[in-house]
Amino acid sequence: MTKNIEYVPEQQDLVWIDFQPSKGNELRGRHPAVVLSASGYTRMTGLVAVSPVTHGINNRLKEMFVPVITNFGIDGYVNPLQFHTFSVVSRNVEYAGGILDDSAFAMVMKTHQQLLNIY
């Protein structure tokens, strides 16, 4: 890894991340997200895997979303149907002040596992 990363995201952290640039109907702008990847992955690659936190109440697949309520200003739903890998430095990843609770994180990871095992 060539760039020095001051903050190394930990799995389950809630972070702020820049989703720009984006194309089509992809999420745009700076949004909260939950970290899916382990910190060792970030140390090795400089990348972080995340699922966005959204307020997308009109999404037809919302029943698969996982509710997020915090005492540090992040609320909405984790969309486990979307997962992205981004550069920690280029996407200006910042710790949001807490983690996703264990049961909600388990639901997100279970949905990911189910999605990746569809064939």
Q: Where is each model-derived feature located?
A:
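Short, charged beta-turn/beta-strand-edge "cap" motif at the junction between a beta-strand
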Residues: Q20-G24
